[in-house]
């Protein structure tokens, strides 16, 4: 449930920040009313796109059975992990310049397009993430997942409101840096779940299984161990393949995060 809350909070916050930047720009224009209408038209289009993707995902799933369903579900979990990685890396590189870039692209229909793409992209990613989390939890109750998503949306609204009011206690850079680590932990948990599934189905060799056994000290089926398993991909008795996959994931993520941004031409 915590994973769903964090994902919806972060995704919704990004969309709200984009809308907030555009509203701020619109308020400074001589005729803001038509621009504001275009903005909300774009938001509605983005929400429609996200809803269509959600309906399409479940419609496609209903067409699969047996091995085909296993492939589809595994692909969705891996897609969710990859999208989280992409989102973290993109925001890490572009987040500090987002306000200037958005205002530079703003225009009558440009506002609608930016809003539609922002809301549609974040909404579509959220659909994939929540679907992947539902598979990871092996049938997480719909009510619990919906409640966590609603709480994440409310928290994003509160965070955006605080940011708009210039709350001194809200350090945006620290907030996003912490959320990057949290989201990468969730992505690694999805990757671990996908590796477990692939090994169980015989699609990946386990190599050494288990590579070690920490179940006596911290079992992953209950209490703190279960929380770590759901949130970070911790396994008390991991297969060597899973450990290698996680090491590769974190090595790539840290390398990309630490890599200096490419200088703009002519800078």
Language model region names:
Residues 1-267:
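Multi-pass alpha-helical transmembrane bundle typical of ion/small-solute transporters
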């Amino acid at each position: 449930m915590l994973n769903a809350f964090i994902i919806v909070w972060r995704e919704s916050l990004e969309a709200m920040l984009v809308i907030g930047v555009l509203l701020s720009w619109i308020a400074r224009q001589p005729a803001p009313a038509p621009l504001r209408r275009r903005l909300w038209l774009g938001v509605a289009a983005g929400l429609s796109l996200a809803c269509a993707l959600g309906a399409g995902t479940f419609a496609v799933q209903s067409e699969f059975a047996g091995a085909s369903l296993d492939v589809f579900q595994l692909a969705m979990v891996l897609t969710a992990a990859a999208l989280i990685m992409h989102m973290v890396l993109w925001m890490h590189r572009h987040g500090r310049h987002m306000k200037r870039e958005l205002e530079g692209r703003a225009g009558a229909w440009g506002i609608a397009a930016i809003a539609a793409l922002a809301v549609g992209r974040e909404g579509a990613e959220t659909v994939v993430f929540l679907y992947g989390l539902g598979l990871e939890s092996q049938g997480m109750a719909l009510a619990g997942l919906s409640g966590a998503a609603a709480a994440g949306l409310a928290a994003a609204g509160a965070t955006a409101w605080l940011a708009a009011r210039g709350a001194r206690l809200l350090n945006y850079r620290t907030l996003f840096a912490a959320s990057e680590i949290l989201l990468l932990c969730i992505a690694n948990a999805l990757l671990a779940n996908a590796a477990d599934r692939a090994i169980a189905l015989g699609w990946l060799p386990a190599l050494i299984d288990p590579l070690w056994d920490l179940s006596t000290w911290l079992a992953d089926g209950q209490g703190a161990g279960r929380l770590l398993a759901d949130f970070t991909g911790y396994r008390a008795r991991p297969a060597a393949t899973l450990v290698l996959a996680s090491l590769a994931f974190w090595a790539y993520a840290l390398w990309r995060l630490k890599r200096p941004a490419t200088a703009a031409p002519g800078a």
